[in-house]
Amino acid sequence: MKSVNAPIMKKDAMALVTGKPVYTDDIAPKDCLVCKILRSQHAHAVIEEINTDIAMKVPGIECILTYEDVPDKRFTMAGQTYPEPSPYDRLILDRRVRFVGDAVAIVAGKTEEAVEKALKLIKVKYEVLEAVLDFHQAKDAKILVHPEENWKALCDVGADNKRNLCATGSEQNGDVDKILEDCDYVVEGTYHTQANQQAMMETFRTYKIGRAHV
């Protein structure tokens, strides 16, 4: 009980705040390419045209990928074991963008300066669509976030992309209505909590080393 209501320092706290641990970016090979993503400026839109010709001419640019270059095979970002309860709703790059900051193109180059320049030279023409901006109104709205036919859910968790539902469910213990009838006072309300992330602070990062360098 001596630890209850007492400040307990994490074992790695001092190392973290003084920058001693090694992160992925600290072990980048000298010849590693720099990759950055062109982000959508629209909350909901479909890419009508995307031109990377001028951007590809920037010295040092090795590759530019758009939705036309990636597999049309959806996957989930969930971390659960297979079969995941979260829907398979993501593409590496999608023709439809669903929020400000959604990925539009991936640029790889030899220097960060070259990649930044190329990002500014990619020309994108959008068909801007009405967006779902209020989660209270999202369910059964006329605007579908995922209207595509190859969206799927592997588990029966009440997911339905035609209703903007990634999952639905309820849990009840006992006769709730009967208990409420017997209460002298009943307080009803809608409550929200902030988003929480229980995982590490570092974002997803990967270095790929070709077989020739192994």
Give residue spans per PLM region.
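Structural alpha/beta core scaffold segments of enzyme domains
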Residues: 1-211
